[in-house]
Amino acid sequence: MIKYSNTNFYRAFRSPISNGEHQNIYIDGTRQPTHMPLEAHQIIDSWFENRFSIKARSSTIFVGTKRESVSKYAQYSSCVVKRISFPTDSKFIYSLSICDLFDEIDDLQHIDGELTKESIHQFLENAEYQITSQPDSIPSDFLGEIMVYCHNFLLQDV
């Protein structure tokens, strides 16, 4: 039986999803970007893999510490926000200075005119991403995205 942490997070889903235990279908790095340019996505994944041995953009579940921090992703009538918890062996990747990495990379592209490997790497270095296996160490008032590397997760209604 899987032991889940008592620390809860929130996630928006595009369509209704049942409560209970689910598998992370992206654990093998199969997630493709929805809005971010593929090349930037791959550069970012490579950086995270070199830093933490995890393709954070392609294999994690994106969550927030508060319902309001994920509500902007639930703007369509079919979307739903759920409370989500993770096994105690999960890894949590985040930066206290980043709310949404996609928005930050989009801003970087507008400022620089183009995205390069060097500019993306420099941006990520400056963001001071960190990894923890202790979800309660993440400040409860942090409103940014958290990328969770896990095989399973548990959903509950909010």
For each predicted feature, which ranges?
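Extracellular structured ligand-interaction cores
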Residues: T7, S58-T60, V81, L143-E145
